[in-house]
């Protein structure tokens, strides 16, 4: 899924090859996220060079990839995919010397990110797109020291990158629109589900939604209103099952019955001011009302409420079955 246009506003050099022609990927930073990226790229048939300053990085990386490989085999390996196509280098410069795409996954420290992206920019072949896995920093704040900021983009994954399809792509104010578009196309070719964001916002989309839930959960624990186990169960046994099939907006639209989101907002919109959360609620004005209703209609893509309900129900059953929580039939229970 892609939302366009990008937030980037300046022009810059194009990448040296088409996204479909990329064969060599560099992963800089090989912790949980960077190592997960390396596993994903290897499973998609790329040659991967990797570098991390930690003395035991190579051992930990190979162990992570080996542990992830059975799951990747179940997902389906690309032709030629092999763990043997990994090369761990002793320097950053070696890792990116002939890279056609670079994925940076260093720790979340702004000064570190700025310095590292500047080093990568200096060492990577001209025009090659460099993406950061940052989970929250806008690229505008990270690209300040780079000589060629036009090729720097955010490519934010979800953990583990080799299993969770989502990657959020967005540029900074000095990123070239062509670089954002190229990165989005490359990730799609590499098997990811891409959201190209219109504008920068700290935390991007999914992390901001997660953070809202996380903060409310912490409030409830701190106030003795719910235990950690109760909070987790409330999601895994409740809305989490629906969210695995369709997102929260379309799920709420179904709660409106045949009237969809418009009916939902008309009847439940006033509850936004109820003390159900410690987050301040937005004003449900006509612009927000219309945007939410129209967005749900677009997401439905012509499917009726009945069609969506059936799709949701099938998906929830599949999730329950996959997680071993599908209630047994009477015959099975009697055995």
From Swiss-Prot:
Coiled-coil stretches: none
Catalyses which reaction(s): carnitine + NAD(+) = 3-dehydrocarnitine + NADH + H(+)
Positions of disulphide bridges: none
GO terms assigned for molecular function: carnitine 3-dehydrogenase activity; NAD+ binding
Gene Ontology biological process terms from the UniProt entry: carnitine metabolic process; catabolic process; fatty acid metabolic process
Cellular localisation: Cytoplasm
Protein keywords: Cytoplasm, NAD, Oxidoreductase
Gene Ontology CC entries for this record: cytoplasm
Highest taxon of source: Bacteria
Residues that, per the record, bind NAD(+): 29-34
InterPro entries named in the record: 3-OHacyl-CoA_DH_NAD-bd (IPR006176), 3HC_DH_C (IPR006108), 6-PGluconate_DH-like_C_sf (IPR008927), 6PGD_dom2 (IPR013328), L-carnitine_dehydrogenase (IPR026578), NAD(P)-bd_dom_sf (IPR036291)
Functional pathway: Amine and polyamine metabolism; carnitine metabolism
Enzyme Commission no: 1.1.1.108
Family: Belongs to the 3-hydroxyacyl-CoA dehydrogenase family. L-carnitine dehydrogenase subfamily.
Function as written in the Swiss-Prot or TrEMBL entry: Catalyzes the NAD(+)-dependent oxidation of L-carnitine to 3-dehydrocarnitine.
HAMAP family named among the record's database cross-references: L_carnitine_dehydrog (MF_02129)
Subunit structure: Homodimer.
Full protein name: L-carnitine dehydrogenase
Organism: Streptomyces griseus subsp. griseus (strain JCM 4626 / CBS 651.72 / NBRC 13350 / KCC S-0626 / ISP 5235)
């Amino acid at each position: 899924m892609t939302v366009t246009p990008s937030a980037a506003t300046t022009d810059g050099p194009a990448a040296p090859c088409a996204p479909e022609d990329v064969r060599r990927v560099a992963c800089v930073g090989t912790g949980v996220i960077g190592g997960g990226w390396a596993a994903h790229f290897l499973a998609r048939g790329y040659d991967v060079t990797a570098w991390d300053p930690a003395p035991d990085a190579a051992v930990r990386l190979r162990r992570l990839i080996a542990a992830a490989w059975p799951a990747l085999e179940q997902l389906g390996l690309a032709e030629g995919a092999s763990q043997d196509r990994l090369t761990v280098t002793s320097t950053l410069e070696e890792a990116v010397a002939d890279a056609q795409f670079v994925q940076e996954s260093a720790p979340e420290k702004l000064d570190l990110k700025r310095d590292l992206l500047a080093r990568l920019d200096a060492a990577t072949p001209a025009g090659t797109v460099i993406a950061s896995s940052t989970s929250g920093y806008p690229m505008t704040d990270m690209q300040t020291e780079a000589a060629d900021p036009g090729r720097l983009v955010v490519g934010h994954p979800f953990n583990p990158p080799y299993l969770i399809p989502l990657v959020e792509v967005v540029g900074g104010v000095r990123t070239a629109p062509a670089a954002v578009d190229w990165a989005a196309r490359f990730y799609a070719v590499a098997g990811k589900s891409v959201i190209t964001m219109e504008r920068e916002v700290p935390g991007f989309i999914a992390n901001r939604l997660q953070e809202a839930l996380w903060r409310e959960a912490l409030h409830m624990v701190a106030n003795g209103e719910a235990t950690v186990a109760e909070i987790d169960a409330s999601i895994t046994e409740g809305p989490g099952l629906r969210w695995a099939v369709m997102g929260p907006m379309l799920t709420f639209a179904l709660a409106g019955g045949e009237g969809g989101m418009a009916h939902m907002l008309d009847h439940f919109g006033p509850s936004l001011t109820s003390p159900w959360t410690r987050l301040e609620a937005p004003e449900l004005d006509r612009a927000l009302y219309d945007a939410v209703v129209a967005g749900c209609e677009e997401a439905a893509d012509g499917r009726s409420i009945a069609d969506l309900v059936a799709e949701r129900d099938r998906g929830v059953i599949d999730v329950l079955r996959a997680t071993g929580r599908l209630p047994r039939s009477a015959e099975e229970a009697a055995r």
